[in-house]
Amino acid sequence: TVYAFSTENWKRSREEVDGLMKLFRSYLKKCIKISRDNKMKIKIIGDISAFAPDIQESIRKLEEFSKDYDELYFQIAMNYGSRDEITRGMRKMAQDVADGKVSPDQITEDTIGSYLDTAGVPDPDLLIRTSGEQRLSNFLMWQLAYTEFYFTDVAWPDFHKAELVQAIEKYNQRDRRYGGVKEE
């Protein structure tokens, strides 16, 4: 999952937001070729209703085009914020409870997960945070519960294959316990 645009990014300057929208228009069209060439399913997570109609249509076309691919799975977070995702999901679940579709005593962690944008997608194993930042920035807060973190001072535009390999090597050295104790 790539965090392309947060719900908070709308607060940036008009020029920067307009530039990002122009980039999205171009990139979403390129994603169809990327999807086809790699047999990759691409899903956009976040609230796309805030985008211009042409961007929403490009998102729908991309997701429809790639829906049957299953070799690779790629998510792009656009107008995404984890708190917003959880709020939207809980509103849907509350409506289903009110409509009698879900009983409150049936609600589990899996039930909650099924109402999130990432429903049906495994939680990340590794989060790579670039540019020296050491915070989640409202990103996948529910899904990152047992994710391993890798922090690097390298800025995103300069993050290349060698840095990715290093992150994966560090990840492979870790003992993932999912809340358990280290076995001796």
Annotate each language-model stretch with its function.
Residues 1-184:
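Flexible, compositionally biased loop and terminal segments
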